[in-house]
A protein has these predicted regions:
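Structural marker of alpha-solenoid helical repeat scaffolds
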Residues: 438, 472, 506, 510-513, ...
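Helix N-cap/loop-to-helix boundary motif
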Residues: 87, 440, 512-515, 556
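Polytopic membrane enzymes that build or remodel cell-surface glycoconjugates and lipids
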Residues: 1-489, 495, 524, 531
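Intrinsically disordered, low-complexity Ser/Thr- and acidic-rich flexible linkers and loops
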Residues: 226-229, 507-516, 558-559
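Terminal, low-structured helical/coil segments at or just beyond the last alpha-helical repeat
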Residues: 516, 527-561
């Protein structure tokens, strides 16, 4: 039986192995520093989280700082600062422990819902060890990804408990976990959709032909028991019509709608939607979304050339769009055709659906895609893969030792790849140099390599990368700023003024996000004007610098009330 002491011990032992392997794999992050992108905004230069008091709590629940509303994430960082101050290792280890906890929760949720120990363990192991998730764990500012996933998994577990015996109290627990997840990061906004998939499989709450993917009578053999060895009594609840199950999700959908409104407002307030520098047309965003679905699939199968930042293409080639569309349609057709294996359809739709908020239809930032967006979506692919391979091996009557050996070899290969990917996070320079190398024509990466070299005292090398960044994307203001500062410091005030004027022109439409950059630019421009004897323009630049400082949103997190 599923609840026998022997099986419980096996599950506990596997959970321990899973957690231990995950922590051991990610333990090197204990020696890694904060990275330049967002870690300062979230921790090192954010005095609001550096005192765990009532003012910080109020600020966490009322701010849209960093273009997000995620109060539990802010409180998590505040607690970490209370424990570790600015020792980056402690913050990193918290992320590693949360990732290990999420892996164990995923194992537990799948096991309780399906009755399969081995398959559930393999899904959780792929989730824990796949290198695509390095970004979510090694980046301290991405704590929000880990927290939201934890609450989503708890909501899934609570929903299975509710489905076994629907009660208001049990449903309320699902709502609570969902609210906590949204207060950590709103990317789990697709939970109601995932729960409908959960109803279809593995809970099988959808009654007969009411399902949008109802099987013909001749195709329905073996569905309810895909030959599970044991099923918990708690799992068997009443079947309902699809309409009733959809109605059941209305409170969750209301929370999703509220979160969407808050998120859009926060992103627009922070200048993330459309970016402060460039916006892309809807056609380009649609084309990029289709291509990126295919790119995510390729990285799930062969996780090579992973990068911190993938630049958004200005033009997407129609051939790429056509091939990606054909692939997605083909895989969808296969999943529907083989829907008697419900896990295939559920896994595929999980992948497609959970990526919708992050696929770029609404532009948030300047990236085409991001490894961190795979943290939730790849779970669907892992489910389809593990259940599909296990059923195939069973049909072929392959020895369990062969399946176990192949699984172990795959996990070891992933651990090696993850360990290597983790080393790129050992410093800003290593991270951005790798990103520039594997992406190509990446102005943001070239600029960040330059900044990293500049901090290391290698100014001449840094200037080459700033020039590369400016050549790749003439609309990016940061390299012009750094080139201007270099000219100013090396006695070329006229050249410096030209660079500073470019920065101001490129950020003319800024709504406050780049006020800090503009303030620094005007300050250096004033010094350059003074060096040329132009006191009138120097005074004007000084006045404008002061005005920009009052618009600088980072000022809010660097001062206390």
């Amino acid at each position: 039986m599923l609840t026998s002491p022997t099986r419980a011990w096996i599950v506990a032992a596997l959970a321990f192995v899973l957690a231990a392997a995950t922590v051991a794999l990610y333990f090197p992050v204990h020696h890694y520093p904060f990275v330049s992108l967002n870690d300062a905004e979230y921790v090192t230069q954010n005095v609001r989280i550096q005192q765990l008091d009532w003012d910080s709590i109020v600020w966490s629940f009322t701010t849209f700082h960093a273009a997000n509303w995620h109060p539990l994430t802010w409180l998590s960082h505040a607690l970490d600062y209370h424990l570790f101050a600015l020792a980056a290792g402690g913050h990193h280890l918290t992320n590693a422990l949360l990732h290990a906890l999420n892996a164990v929760l995923l194992f537990w949720v799948l096991w309780r819902a399906t009755g399969y120990v081995g398959r559930s363990f393999m899904v959780a192991a792929l989730f824990a060890l796949h290198p695509i998730n390095v970004e979510s764990v090694a980046w301290i500012a991405e704590r929000k990804n880990l927290l939201s996933m934890m609450f989503l998994l708890l909501a899934l577990g609570a929903y299975r408990w509710y489905a076994a015996r629907p009660r208001v109290g049990r449903y309320t627990l699902v709502l609570i976990f969902y609210v906590f997840g949204l207060m950590s990061k709103p990317q789990i906004i697709t939970l109601p959709f995932l729960l409908l998939l959960w109803d279809y499989w593995p809970l099988e709450r959808v009654a007969g032909r009411s399902s949008p993917f109802a099987l013909r009578q001749s195709d329905s053999r073996g569905v309810s028991g895909e030959k599970r060895k044991a099923i918990s009594e708690e799992r068997s609840g009443e079947q309902r019509s699809f309409g009733w199950l959809l109605l059941e999700k209305l409170p969750l959908l209301a929370l999703s709608a509220a979160s969407a409104v808050i998120t859009v407002h926060a992103q627009r307030s922070g200048g993330a939607m459309g970016g402060a520098l460039r916006s892309y047309s809807l056609v380009v965003r649609l084309e990029n979304a289709v291509v990126c679905y295919a790119r995510y699939l390729s990285k799930a199968i062969w996780p090579a050339r992973l990068a911190f930042f993938y630049p958004h293409p200005v033009i997407v080639h129609l051939r790429q769009v056509a091939m990606a569309s054909l692939l997605l349609l083909l895989l969808t057709a296969v999943a529907v055709a083989l829907r008697r294996h419900r896990y295939l359809l559920v896994g595929w739709l999980w992948f497609l659906g959970s990526l919708v908020p992050m696929i770029g239809l609404l532009q948030v930032g300047g990236q085409a895609m991001a490894d961190r967006y795979a943290y939730l979506s790849f779970v669907g692919l892992f489910i389809a893969l593990c259940w599909g391979v296990a059923d195939w091996a069973k049909q072929r009557r392959l020895p369990n030792s062969c399946v176990a050996g192949a699984s172990l070899a795959l996990l070891l290969a992933l651990m090696i790849a993850t360990h290597r990917q983790l080393t790129y996070w050992s410093s800003d320079l290593a991270l951005w140099a790798h990103t520039a190398q594997v992406t190509g024509n990446n102005s943001a990466a070239e600029n960040m390599v330059g900044e990293s070299l500049q901090k290391a005292g290698r100014a001449q090398e840094a200037m080459e990368h700033f020039r590369n960044a400016a050549a790749i994307d003439p609309l990016l203001p940061y390299p012009h700023y750094h080139l201007g500062v270099y000219d100013e410091e090396n006695g070329n005030p006229q050249d410096a003024i030209l660079q500073f004027k470019r920065v101001i022109a490129l950020t003319q439409s800024d709504t406050g996000v780049l006020a800090g950059l503009r303030a620094n630019t005007f300050t250096h421009m004033a010094s350059s004007y003074e060096a040329t004897g132009d006191t009138a323009n120097a005074e004007r630049a000084t006045r404008l610098a002061s005005e920009e400082q009052h618009r600088d949103w980072s000022f809010e997190t660097n001062t206390r009330p």
